[in-house]
């Protein structure tokens, strides 16, 4: 479940962090960053009930519509729990990574741009490698939170933790 959560949270959180740190205008950043940090404060039980009542049945119905018959995703499965946990962890990854990317010295960015690199090349070749140790720490912190969260899994997995190999099968 933590693996599914990390597969959801890390790419989206890193992309949001890069956007906020490098591309967003100060006005947009002043709105988006506090909103993301506010999302990090939502209790786990709220996410669990959201998974149980809304997301699980929606994924089941979507998979039934895609196959034209029986659903291949059950409402209460590892995938649903991991997806909701990933949504819950996006603000953590994003906020920590944004702070780390913002801490990269401006001189490194200016040096890269002065040598003729584009903005995206500077981010890819200079900023992210310089911020990598901190980003890895943020991902490890997020992974430990994902492993530690249990309430969302209990609710989204149908209150019976019988693990199966198939992440789309009901638990």
Task: Give a label for each model feature.
Residues 9-12, 36-44, 72-98, 129, ...:
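Faces of alpha-helical transmembrane segments in polytopic inner-membrane proteins
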Residues 12-51, 95-96:
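Cytoplasmic-entry segments and transmembrane alpha-helices of multi-pass inner-membrane transporters
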Residues 3-4, 8, 12, 16, ...:
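Hydrophobic alpha-helical transmembrane segments of multipass integral membrane proteins
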Residues 1-7, 25, 71:
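Periplasmic/extracellular loop-to-transmembrane helix junction in inner-membrane transport proteins
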Residues 146-171:
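Glycine-rich helix-loop "coupling/hinge" segments at transmembrane-helix boundaries
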Residues 11-14, 24-28, 96-110, 119-121, ...:
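Transmembrane helix boundary and interhelical loop/hinge segments in multi-pass membrane proteins
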Residues 1, 48-87, 157-160:
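Membrane-interfacial helix termini and adjacent extracytoplasmic/periplasmic loops
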Residues 95-97, 113, 119-154:
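Transmembrane alpha-helices
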């Amino acid at each position: 479940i933590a693996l599914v959560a990390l597969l959801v949270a890390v790419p989206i959180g890193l992309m949001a962090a890069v956007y906020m740190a490098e591309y967003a205008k100060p006005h947009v950043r002043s709105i988006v960053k506090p909103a993301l940090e506010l999302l990090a404060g939502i209790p786990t039980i709220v996410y669990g009930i959201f998974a149980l009542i809304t997301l699980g049945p929606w994924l089941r119905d979507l998979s039934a519509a895609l196959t034209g018959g029986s659903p291949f995703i059950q409402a209460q499965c590892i995938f649903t729990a991991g997806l909701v946990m990933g949504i819950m962890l996006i603000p953590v990854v994003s906020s920590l990574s944004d702070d780390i990317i913002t801490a990269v010295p401006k001189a490194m960015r200016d040096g890269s741009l002065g040598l003729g690199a584009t903005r995206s090349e500077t981010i890819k070749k200079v900023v992210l490698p310089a911020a990598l140790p901190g980003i890895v720490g943020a991902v490890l912190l997020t992974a430990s939170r994902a492993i530690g969260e249990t309430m969302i899994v209990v609710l989204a997995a149908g209150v019976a933790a019988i693990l199966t190999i198939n992440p789309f099968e009901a638990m």
